[in-house]
């Protein structure tokens, strides 16, 4: 079942934790690629110096952040790596959750090809398929084309995992500082990164 629009409303930190264990799905050329979300970071808008929307900055790039929750915010870093975010909070409140790492589930062969141009890969390469925001976007074929797409779409959405299959019973959720935001002054220390402790696909222990 797809996560309904109401799933993305409410406090961004709570939505971030709710996303853990759910499945990010992207249909590419009719083939389902997906992974279980195992690591996220919350960004809380105008008051968060690490957020693109800090101070209420409104640009062509960040416009989607000011819109309805439950949409995709995709951007480039270093001019080459895509990052996928889920927009949260009410319209006009530019907050979101960065998906940092996934455990691959569906379309594994397509994911391998997208990452390594081959399907015969080592165990180390397998662990590196989706253990970072740029890696998971490459693996799932998420690009700037997906910016602003509703997560109610058939091709890009969050699939809710039934409780009996949910990995939250196997892993403890841990909170800590976000990664690579050295510019963000006091916001560097906010414990707004959430991940499954000990999960092999988490990007940084």
Curated annotation (Swiss-Prot):
Q: What is its EC number?
A: 3.2.2.-
In Pfam terms, one family for this protein is: Pur_DNA_glyco
Show the InterPro entries listed in the entry. Answer: Formyl_transferase-like_C_sf, MPG, MPG_sf
Q: Which GO terms describe its molecular function?
A: alkylbase DNA N-glycosylase activity; DNA binding
Q: Which domain of life is it from?
A: Bacteria
For biological process, the GO terms are: base-excision repair
UniProt entry keywords in alphabetical sequence: DNA damage, DNA repair, Hydrolase
So what family is this one in? Belongs to the DNA glycosylase MPG family.
Name of this chain's protein: Putative 3-methyladenine DNA glycosylase
């Amino acid at each position: 079942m797809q996560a309904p629009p109401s799933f993305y409303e409410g406090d961004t930190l709570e939505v971030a934790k709710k996303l853990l264990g759910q499945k990010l799905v992207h249909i590419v050329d009719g083939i389902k690629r997906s992974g279980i979300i195992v690591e996220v970071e919350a960004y809380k808008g105008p008051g968060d110096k690490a957020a693109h929307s800090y101070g209420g900055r409104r640009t062509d790039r960040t416009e989607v952040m000011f819109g309805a929750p439950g949409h995709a915010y995709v951007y480039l870093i270093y001019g080459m790596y895509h990052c996928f975010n889920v927009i949260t909070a009410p319209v006009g409140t530019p907050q979101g959750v960065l998906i940092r790492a996934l455990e691959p589930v569906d379309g594994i062969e397509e994911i391998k090809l997208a990452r390594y141009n081959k399907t015969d890969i080592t165990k180390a390469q397998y662990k590196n398929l989706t253990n970072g925001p740029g890696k998971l976007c490459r693996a799932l074929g998420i690009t700037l084309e997906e910016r602003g797409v509703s997560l109610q779409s058939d091709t890009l959405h969050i699939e809710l995992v039934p409780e009996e299959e949910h990995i939250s019973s196997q892993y403890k959720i841990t909170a800590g500082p976000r990664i690579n935001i050295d510019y963000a002054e006091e916001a560097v220390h906010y414990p707004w990164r959430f991940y499954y402790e000990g999960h092999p696909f988490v990007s940084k222990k």
